[in-house]
Amino acid sequence: MASPPPFDICGDLDDDPTPPAPTPLAAPTPNGLNDRLLRLTRTHQRGPSQNPNPNPNPNPKPPPPPPPQEPEPAKVKLAGRRRLCKLSTAGDESAGDDDSIRDILDDLTTRLDSLSVDRPTARPRPHVSPLPCALHADPDPSQSQLNDGTKPSSSFVDCDDDDDDAGGAYGGFGVKEEVTRKVFKASSSFGGRGNDDKMKAKGAYAFDTVSRKTTTESKASKFFGDYDDEDDIDQDAENGKENHADDVGWEKTEDFKMEPTGTGVTRKPYNLPGRIFNMLYPHQREGLRWLWVLHCRGTGGILGDDMGLGKTMQVSAFLAGLFHSRLIKRVLVVAPKTLLTHWTKELSVVSLKDKIRDYSGPNANARNYELKYAFKEGGILLTTYDIVRNNFKMIKGNFTNDFDDEEETLWNYVILDEGHIIKNPKTQRAQSLFEIPCAHRIVISGTPIQNNLKEMWALFYFCCPEVLGDKEQFKARYEHAIIQGNDKNATNRQKHIGSNVAKELRERIKPYFLRRMKNEVFLDSGTGEDKKLAKKNELIIWLKLTSCQRQLYEAFLNSELVHSSMQGSPLAAITILKKICDHPLLLTKKAAEGVLEGMDAMLNNQEMGMVEKMAMNLADMAHDDDDVELQVGQDVSCKLSFMMSLLQNLVSEGHNVLIFSQTRKMLNIIQEAIILEGYKFLRIDGTTKISERERIVKDFQEGPGAPIFLLTTQVGGLGLTLTKAARVIVVDPAWNPSTDNQSVDRAYRIGQMKDVIVYRLMTSGTIEEKIYKLQVFKGALFRTATEHKEQTRYFSKRDIQELFSLPEQGFDVSLTQKQLQEEHGQQLVMDDSLRKHIQFLEQQGIAGVSHHSLLFSKTAILPTLNDNDGLDSRRAMPMAKHYYKGASSDYVANGAAYAMKPKEFIARTYSPNSTSTESPEEIKAKINRLSQTLANTVLVAKLPDRGDKIRRQINELDEKLTVIESSPEPLERKGPTEVICLDDLSV
């Protein structure tokens, strides 16, 4: 059988010009990424058409048959990759173009992965040996080759030898193209984490050479590595650093290094780049050492430096060293909203900009993203107190598993700026912060004691609760004795006991509390360029009430509102009296009606016409828009009248002035008066947006005009630097002395080169004089608890609590001014310009001038004790050494008698103010018996509390004896005595 003729494809096509019928197409399907990639590679391989003739051939030749399809390369799963990766060899020349395209796609994939917080953590690849990865000055990736001369393909994880990685890894050192050789030692931890994160895998690389060029241009991109708390780092690689600075002509900057101290868990040293360390003042460098000691002890503390000494910069630099040393991973910074911008600025200065995560915006989704990123990658989370209060469960990690379970605590540090905000531990703000787990807590506050000692205890209880114990212990051991000893009318024995207890308190908190004052850090003796801070003179301007203010003040004291407030809360009546002292137009309708009620007994006075007219106008009973005096009322308010005379003098001399008031309504009145005089001004209050505040502050600091800046104390007194102004006017005093101090320190801070004069306006013989006395009393408590010298006792609480009474000397004389003049009159040292300025002030019809800066400038001398007082004090002092050694359980009275029979025990307490029928001799006998029981060491050793309850009973009996001995004879009282607690008044 003959075989069939061979089938000639080309012959058949030549014989029959008719093309065959097209094959029916399948249903169109969407092209995937691989299909588009295959089409692109084939088109790239074929290249453009070689036929230059654009006209088609009428008889075209059929296309050549397609080449046999080659098998697709195998795909494998690599750690750190989302997609399957094709394997290729370096000798496969045909895949060169495919490799370049795949490299582009892989690079895009890794970049997208780096933007996601959900990407998997890089895992080590045990089957791939570590590859030496070198960075060269030539940024061309094609020059990077392996030791065997082959080009690395996409089957290996990319090394950091591209432009972005080289610049990112050394951006913090300010190194540009002068880099000649930088070697990293690679561990077995490889994984694709994107260009920005490849060099930051945990424990992946250790610097072998650290040389840098000192320049002001430095990137903050990848200066610090991630948190690393493992001990398997090659210490020889870290310590055996080879210096190549001489080869390239670099100027080397030495790092600041501190070794671990004590027996804490920290075993790695602290390293801070020298560029950052050189930015700090000497007192800030000392602050770094103090913070490092706390870190090694595993506890926290209070940074209480005076306002304007750069507390934020100290903490930022300390965090920079911790991140640089790989000692921490996450930090939570809680601050008022107005201070977050300042924190961002300071953290950026120390090259921590890329560590910042903002958790303060209004968008909840954006905040949650930042929080999740901080959990995943670490960093510094900036937020506010209110956001923590509402979201503390999320911040403590209740709803996420993004952090490693091996970590002991979620947050390494919780830092509270303006930490006195949590001075009341019962508030939701304080309780929410207590819920957040952390290893260290740092409180930043220039005023840790604002009203009473309990506020200082609250701050210590937050950051280091083991220092002062619980609240009851602190009150019984420290607070009561110090307050009694600080009273001007205290007995000699009370003063000695208070002084010794205060000394013990200072020694107790000394390791955990750091406070430096500006006059201690920057001495006033400097001149010229050596003078880092100017002088400050604070003056109390004692003003005389106008006739209108006097009539309103007296009328309100006779009103029913004052009499009813004496039986209840006096705050409403106190507020009205303060408004009358500032400006009568501040009175509300209800307050004006109360003033009218008190005018019945004063109708025969000559000047009642205008006063009654103003009161009726305020109460909406009369309307007289033509009365200019009622609209602005410079002659109605002594403060406004004096202020306009002072501004005329200051502006004419070219000074810039800050004016602070507690209320926006008072600022409105001042603003109207300034507009009438034609002065330019700027203003910030609670209605000003934060973005606008920054612009307004910049305009004042750098702008050519607007010599007057109006601010409210609650907004403008916090976080602003206004060193262009050298004159500050505080219109109305606050119950909280730190409020006024913060306002003053907007101008008196680092960077102020002019001498600052502060004017605190006070009205003589009014409620404001009582407020000023209370400020001084609170300031004495703070200094007694924190400063190592005996403080002057200016006032007693009995002087302060006489609020609702007319001054016997009238409104033209200030007894406080006379007392301060007698106390500090001989200390006045003024230059000619200040002396002339005070003479000008005294010509404005004021009651007098006091020098607030001289308060507490003298060291008081304790009076000598008689024999009986000396015996009592010697007996009481040993108890100060043993009182606090017990546990934190509550002390109870009569513990010795019922130590072995706790079920039959009935607690008995003593009130210092209660009347006792026991004589001092009987109380002393009880103390002696209990002391003998306490001396029986065998019995005390068997007690569960080791005698703490007995010591508590002895202390209570001793306090009771002190009250009885110091109490005067009972006086006949004409009526019910008003009892007002002024310690908690902080507004």
From Swiss-Prot:
Residues 99-110 have a biased composition (Basic and acidic residues). Residues 292-466 form the Helicase ATP-binding domain. This is SNF2 domain-containing protein ENL1. CDD domains: SF2_C_SNF. It is found in: Cytoplasm; Chromosome. It comes from Oryza sativa subsp. japonica. Residues 1-172, 224-245 are annotated as: Disordered. Disulfide bonds: none annotated. It is an enzyme of class 3 (hydrolase). The keyword Cell division applies. Expressed in ovaries, roots, shoots and leaves. The keyword Iron-sulfur does not apply. Its main location: cytoplasm. Residues 226-237 have a biased composition (Acidic residues). GO terms for molecular function: ATP binding; DNA translocase activity; helicase activity; hydrolase activity. Residues 141-156 have a biased composition (Polar residues). A motif (DEAH box) lies at residues 417-420. Residues 645-801 form the Helicase C-terminal domain. Its EC number is 3.6.4.-. GO terms for cellular component: chromosome; cytoplasm. ATP binds at D305, D306, M307, G308, L309, G310, K311, T312. GO terms for biological process: cell division; DNA recombination; DNA repair; regulation of endosperm development; regulation of mitotic sister chromatid separation. DNA helicase that acts as an essential component of the spindle assembly checkpoint. Plays an indispensable role in the development of seed endosperm. Is required to secure sister chromosome separation during endosperm syncytial mitosis, which involves extremely rapid free nuclear cycles. Disruption phenotype: Lack of seed endosperm, alteration of ovary and embryo shape, reduced root and plant growth, but fertile plants. Residues 18-27, 51-71 have a biased composition (Pro residues). Pfam families: Helicase_C (PF00271), SNF2-rel_dom (PF00176). InterPro entries: Helicase_ATP-bd, Helicase_C-like, P-loop_NTPase, SNF2-like_sf, SNF2/RAD54-like_C, SNF2_N, SNF2_RAD54_helicase_repair.
